[in-house]
């Protein structure tokens, strides 16, 4: 603990607020909150911490704090700071899992769509659904029952759905605003649990149609009722009042927490969400922060009611979330909370050993790698690889590993702009220059280690840009491959020397994974780019074939060869004029055409 931290600890106030832990670069690596800042922050430096917390404390070189007037303000501030800084040790909600919802848009001609994005717009959202199939099946059922618009851009001409009786937006006299509101209200009622009343009304209509000898209409209604039964009865009933609820249960051990969330919609348990993560504050404060972020900063629609176990500050959560947050003390609701807690315990016990082993293995790998290179532990590693075929469509790719694990959000692809021909060294210079010029311009975090796929030439090219042009002093290593294109050795220094990594060591496995991953990412990007240029180049040369017609042809015929075999009549069926179809076929079947 340095002198600066000692001084700050001595003057910490005993008030609610948030604290920001920083590393040697001034980067915020952890954000926390507390009712009493002095007690909480001091506990990191003066308590007996587990290995995980010790690792965090070892990286802390400074901290800041912000005092708030209440615990509610501290919770809201904590969530906003975590969203702003995305600290490495605040990992509780980084899986980006999102669920499908049904949405009625707020357009003049509203649509019913499946979406995973919750926007603050005037649309109405219903869900979440356990998977996209369940959401689409429900949408399909509602499409049969209610004639909302199906097409994206109604042109005024009747569409296929209009002729099927499933869309009125293209009719000569489309529904009025009032009629649309009535349809939207019926769909909303259906999705909020009113499908039983709708089923009952349909049964009455079927009876009347049958009595009037209108058997065709009676059969249509019967089919609709069967679709309702098939779609809505797939899920197990759990509560009789059909209120939308989320139920939280949690368990913790050895500095790790598991949270189980049960999604109850229309009285039915439709899905559960499991999160396992390390935590550094008290369990009670951690679960409150988790639930707050779950709704305010993640892709989750707030239900009418949230149920939580005993010991959670439900009043604080209710004020922050502005919904009902209850602690049930008896009955079926209490049983469901206990079930969520039990599932959290089981999940934690099942996953704990695997998570702990994986954590130890990856941390050990980067620590060993740092020791072998005689540098500080490389928490952030950026790796580069180039790809081209005889200089055509040259590309480069960069991947990021943080604490021994890939962070795919940080991956980047580069089309090479200035290099002509197969020059791997100039390609490396260009991509390193572009990457770290931007890092400096936008004040982005610098890596602890850069790895390039290649030997002395690639390393020299990268160092030339980093040190001579940009004035950066970042450790750089190279990865050489054997004749079977497998990771052979790690090179470091200039001139490069072989780093003696044991082939069975975690450090060697790590650099091998990095080399394989950056190669995969680069070659995939190159194939996509090359495939796109080969696939579309010939169509681009034909007068009268713009982007829409090109997409239409490729979507229908799948390949250039299949387009060659088509007839003018085949293309006319797609709405392509005869003269354009003739131009396409003449061009593609000319002797100078290259096969693709």
Curated annotation (Swiss-Prot):
Which InterPro entries does UniProt cross-reference here? GIY-YIG_endonuc (IPR000305), GIY-YIG_endonuc_sf (IPR035901), GIY-YIG_UvrC_Cho (IPR047296), RuvA_2-like (IPR010994), UVR_dom (IPR001943), UVR_dom_sf (IPR036876), UvrABC_protein_C (IPR050066), UvrC (IPR004791)
Top-level taxon: Bacteria
One Pfam family from the UniProt entry?
UvrC_RNaseH
- For this UniProt entry, what's an example GO CC term? excinuclease repair complex
Keyword DNA damage set for record: yes
Where found in the cell? Cytoplasm
Entry-linked SMART domains = GIYc
Does DNA damage count among this protein's keywords?
A: yes
Q: Where is the UVR domain?
A: 196-231
A GO BP term here is:
SOS response
Which GO molecular-function terms appear in the entry?
A: DNA binding; excinuclease ABC activity
Q: Where is the GIY-YIG domain?
A: 14-91
UniProt keywords (A-Z) are: Cytoplasm, DNA damage, DNA excision, DNA repair, Excision nuclease, SOS response
What family is reported? Belongs to the UvrC family.
Describe the function of this protein: The UvrABC repair system catalyzes the recognition and processing of DNA lesions. UvrC both incises the 5' and 3' sides of the lesion. The N-terminal half is responsible for the 3' incision and the C-terminal half is responsible for the 5' incision.
Q: How does it assemble?
A: Interacts with UvrB in an incision complex.
Query: What is this protein called in UniProt?
Result: UvrABC system protein C
Lineage of source species: Bacteria, Bacillati, Bacillota, Bacilli, Bacillales
């Amino acid at each position: 603990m340095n002198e600066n931290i000692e001084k700050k600890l001595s003057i910490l106030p005993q008030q609610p607020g948030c604290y920001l832990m920083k590393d040697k670069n001034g980067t915020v690596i952890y954000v926390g909150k507390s009712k009493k800042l002095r007690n909480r922050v001091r506990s990191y430096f003066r308590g007996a911490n587990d290995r995980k917390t010790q690792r965090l404390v070892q990286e802390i070189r400074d901290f800041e704090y912000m005092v708030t007037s209440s615990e509610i303000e501290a919770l809201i501030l904590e969530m906003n700071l975590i969203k702003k800084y995305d600290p490495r040790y605040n990992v509780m909600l980084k899986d980006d899992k999102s669920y499908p919802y049904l949405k009625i848009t707020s357009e003049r001609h509203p649509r019913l769509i499946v979406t995973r994005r919750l926007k603050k717009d005037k649309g109405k959202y219903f869900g979440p659904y356990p998977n996209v199939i369940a959401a689409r099946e429900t949408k399909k059922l509602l499409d049969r029952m209610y004639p909302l618009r199906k097409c994206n851009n109604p042109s005024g001409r009747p569409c296929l759905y209009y002729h099927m009786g499933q869309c009125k937006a293209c009719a000569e006299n489309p529904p009025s605003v009032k009629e649309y509101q009535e349809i939207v209200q019926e769909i909303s009622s259906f999705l909020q649990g009113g499908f039983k009343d709708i089923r009952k009304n349909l049964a009455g209509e079927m009876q009347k149609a049958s009595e009037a000898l209108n058997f065709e209409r009676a059969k249509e209604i019967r089919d609709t009722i069967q679709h309702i039964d098939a779609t809505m009865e797939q899920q197990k009933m759990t509560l009789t009042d059909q209120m939308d609820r989320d139920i939280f249960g949690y368990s913790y051990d050895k500095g790790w927490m598991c949270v189980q969330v049960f999604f109850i919609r229309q009285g039915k348990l439709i899905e559960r969400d499991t999160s396992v993560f390390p935590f550094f504050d008290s369990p009670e404060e951690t679960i409150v922060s988790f639930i707050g972020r779950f709704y305010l900063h993640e892709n989750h629609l707030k239900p009418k009611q949230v149920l939580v176990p005993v010991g959670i500050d439900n009043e604080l959560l209710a004020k922050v979330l502005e919904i009902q947050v209850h602690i049930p003390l008896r009955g079926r609701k209490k049983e469901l909370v206990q079930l969520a807690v039990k599932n959290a315990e089981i999940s934690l016990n099942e996953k704990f050993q695997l998570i702990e082993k994986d954590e130890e293995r990856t941390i050990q790998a980067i620590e060993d790698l740092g020791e072998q290179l005689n540098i500080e532990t490389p928490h952030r590693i950026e790796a580069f690889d180039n790809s081209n075929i005889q200089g055509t469509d040259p590309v480069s790719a960069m991947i990021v590993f943080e604490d021994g694990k890939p962070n795919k959000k940080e991956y980047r692809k580069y089309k090479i702009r200035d290099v002509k021909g197969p020059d791997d060294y100039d390609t490396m210079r260009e991509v390193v220059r572009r990457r770290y010029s931007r890092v400096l311009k936008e004040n982005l975090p610098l890596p602890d280690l850069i790895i390039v796929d290649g030997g002395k030439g690639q390393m020299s090219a990268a160092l030339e840009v980093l040190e001579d042009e940009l004035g950066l002093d970042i450790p750089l290593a190279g990865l050489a491959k054997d004749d079977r294109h497998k990771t052979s050795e790690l090179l470091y220094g200039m001139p490069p020397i072989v780093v003696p990594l044991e082939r069975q060591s975690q450090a060697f496995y790590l650099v091998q994974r990095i080399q394989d991953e950056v190669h995969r990412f680069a070659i995939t990007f190159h194939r996509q780019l090359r495939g796109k240029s080969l696939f579309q180049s010939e169509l681009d040369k034909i007068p009268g074939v713009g982007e829409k017609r090109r997409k239409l042809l490729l979507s229908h015929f799948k390949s250039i060869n299949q387009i060659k075999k088509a007839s003018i009549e085949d293309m006319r069926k797609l709405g392509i004029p005869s003269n354009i179809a003739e131009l396409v076929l003449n061009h593609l079947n000319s002797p100078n055409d290259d096969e693709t």
